[in-house]
Amino acid sequence: MKVRRLWWLALPVVVLALLVAGCGGDDEDEAGGTTAAETTEPQEMTDVTLQLKWVTQGQFAGYYAALEQGYYEDEGLNVTIRPGGPDIVPEQVVLGGQAEFGINWLDNTLATRDQGGTIVNIAQVFARSGMTELTWADSGLEEITDLRGKKVGVWLGGNEHKLFAALTKNGIDPQKDAEIVAQPFDMNLFLNREVDAAAAMTYNELAQVLESKNPDSGELYTLDDLNVFKMSDLGTGALEDGIFVTEEWIADEANQDVATRFLKASFKGWIYCRDNPDDCTQYVLDAGPTLGEGHQRWMVNEINKLIWPNETGIGVMSEADYATTAQIAQDYGIVKNDPGDGVYTTEYAAAAVAALEEEGLDVKGADYEAPEVEVTEGGE
């Protein structure tokens, strides 16, 4: 009752103020006074951090585009993009509160939750897997089953899940039937033929091989020199780059709004990279990657292939795709327990996609066709 009484007491004052403002408005405008638009308070910015899965490179071009194009700022977000590295586990960073958003593969999200980590996927950016295992065409290792008893390189720390699943599916126990070699984050072991097979992402390590010269011919290697075993063809192509947060953080309604705005801006960045790959290559170069322009151009192009076309709209994970990855995780020992509910939500990604559609943007890229990108020596 006290609040209502004060409201009525204040009403005459408000009316009087409006009358005074109405009488004096024209004179103030003529005198060059401040307009209502000019006195509008600037939008309050929210600080958030995005932890990348890996170092600065074309794999993350859409986020750099969102930053450089001002999409995050348009959504009232001051975003810090934090590069990853061999000693950085995105899940640990986010669970530790050093970042609100993290990027990693969906099988890693499942594994983290299986171990008690309270993270949830809120957007599945990559619609397909880019992981492969390479052998030399002249090695006679033409099928995944040929890797029994061979030196098989792969990155560890959770990056081995899909390969181990592929080996297991084909009757090869990774712990007993092959010599697993901890692969550095380059292709030197493979190029020097110190391993029989090596892991390679279509957008990164595969290009590193193609950017290298065959010492016998003096020419760059080509795909004809390689056997490429795609995890997607082998039935173990679990989904890769997705955006995750903690359950505790997303439970806050204010953070749910932040998440939707963050996804909207990020998706808009990826749409921009689909339509303007050269610009996005430059944004990555400006951010200071290790490898050169030619390599980043290849990477942006290959990443676009993993995102587009997207039947459900960028970032919105289909139930079928999730079920496939969850089944792979269960069948091949990536997780010990049934993942259950709560691994992912499409609520915020769907809201972001709907907002972008209202702006007239193409969120599915149904007609997308990747251009040809020339391989350059050394990725320069």
What are these regions (language model features)?
Residues 1-10:
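Bacterial N-terminal signal peptides that target proteins for export
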Residues 18-22:
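C-terminal motif of bacterial Sec signal peptides marking the signal peptidase cleavage site
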Residues 253-336:
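Secondary-structure end/capping motifs
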Residues 323-380:
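Conserved C-terminal helix/tail region of periplasmic/extracytoplasmic solute-binding proteins
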Residues 23-35:
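Bacterial lipoprotein signal-peptidase II cleavage site
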Residues 41-184, 188-192, 196-203, 223-225, ...:
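Short, glycine-/small- and polar/acidic-enriched structural segments
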Residues 65, 131-141, 239-255, 310:
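A bilobed periplasmic-binding-protein/Venus flytrap-type ligand-binding module shared by bacterial periplasmic
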Residues 107-108, 185-188, 195-289:
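Pocket-lining segment of extracytoplasmic ligand-binding domains
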